[in-house]
Amino acid sequence: MSGVFTRLVGQSAVESELVGAAWAARGDSPHGTAGTGSMTHAWLITGPPGSGRSVAALCFAAALQCTSESTPGCGQCRACTTAMAGTHADIRRVIPEGLSIGVDEMRDLVAAASRRPSTGRWQIVIIEDADRLTEGGANVLLKVVEEPPASTVFLLCAPSVDPEDIAITLRSRCRHVALLTPSADDIAQVLMERDGLAEAEARWAAAVSGGHVGRARRLATDPEARA
């Protein structure tokens, strides 16, 4: 993996799919000269806990906004760096503070997301824990997803496509990307290369983490987490 997608662990197929979509979107941006109308405006990214759903969404958002002429998601341009830092003006992240995401919050979000991008190619909305959408909140989102603004892309993150996690009608309007549970080898490699851990320690943490990257990192670096 390269660029922003180095943040993902053990998801090479997902990287290929998202990079390919970002390449295609460059010719489809409303601010480009050769739009084809083929851009999917709603995506559903699913995967088990610790697989990197929100990370994948953020990497994809960066790739869509990337201004480099090389592979989208270069990780070096201002669009990529601000996207990954959470400061890009045209990327909004919805992280639930409570147990649910209701109607009022979604209405405010949809209104803001309907504006034209100020600096980027797209106005992107990342809804982490989309499984917390209330029925009313999901209906508000469904209406805009059915007839999306030309410059807006919604990235939804949920554990699965099960109706308990995402409304069937909303799921049917989204392009689905499924993350896998990272292998112990992939997790150990990241702990060694990115966190500088010794091989034995990294492999132990990866083996007992249950495929959860964050848990493996805590087990390897925080003595209290092992108690």
Question: What do these predicted ranges mean?
Answer:
Residues 74-80:
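Short cysteine clusters
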Residues 103, 134-136, 164, 168:
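Conserved D-loop-proximal element of ABC-family nucleotide-binding domains
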Residues 97-103, 130, 176:
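Flexible beta-alpha connector loops of hexameric P-loop NTPases
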Residues 18-23, 30-32, 83, 103-124, ...:
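Conserved alpha-helical scaffold flanking the Walker A/P-loop in AAA+ ATPase domains
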Residues 1-62, 82, 150-152, 158-227:
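Charged, glycine-rich active-site and insertion segments that engage polyanionic ligands
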Residues 42, 71-74:
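Residues immediately within or flanking Cys/His clusters that coordinate Zn2+
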Residues 51, 100, 132-133, 147, ...:
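Residues immediately C-terminal
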Residues 125-128, 141, 152-159:
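Structural recognition of the conserved hydrophobic beta-strand(s) that form the central parallel beta-sheet
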